[in-house]
Amino acid sequence: MDEVQYDMYTTLATLYDTQDLTMPSSNAQRIGAIAETRFITECLERDFEPHTPTTPMPWDYIVHCPAGDLKVQIKSTSVRDRSAYTVNSSCGASVKGHMSDDIDVVGIYISPLQEWWMIPRYLIKSKTIKLYPENPSKSKYKQYQNNWSVYYE
């Protein structure tokens, strides 16, 4: 590559804003980024098509799958409190808000267990979701543990 062409590419590269290429700044943001990346991988391995919205929406992905086009909100947690993993069901930075009724599925990734819970949105009534991976009698969402059937129904 000649020097003129190299300078042109270097100039073009500096015009792009690389702000979005920075690493997540907190551990929670890293866990969220890992969960979203794993979700995309899981979808592609199942021949689903995950699409991110181009404008801010209450869902993270629209997933084209055998059940149709589903709006999916991804949540993640790594903190265990006694026998439960707890996730806030609100969207955004505020825990006062509520989860949008436009969402079809809430995908929750428990990072230490590397496990997914795919819960239909209409079943979530409270601002916190408690998941009990080892205690089926306490968990009202146990049937959605590592269960992707909502994408096939």
Q: How would you name each of these model-derived features?
A:
Residues 8-51:
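Acidic-basic catalytic patches of nuclease active cores, encompassing PD-(D/E)XK
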Residues 75-117, 121:
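Catalytic cores of nucleic-acid endonucleases
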Residues 26-28, 32, 46, 97-98, ...:
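Residue-level recognition of single "structural anchor" positions
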Residues 43, 61-63, 68-78:
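Conserved catalytic cores of phosphodiester-cleaving nucleases, focusing on short active-site segments
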Residues 54-56:
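Short, glycine-/polar-rich solvent-exposed loops and beta-turns at beta-strand/coil boundaries
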Residues 40-44, 70, 87-99, 150-153:
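Conserved functional hotspots at enzyme active or ligand-binding sites that engage polyanionic ligands
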Residues 2-4, 8-21, 124-153:
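Charged phosphate-binding loop/patch that engages nucleotide di/tri-phosphates or the phosphate backbone
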Residues 70, 115-117, 127:
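Short beta-strand segments
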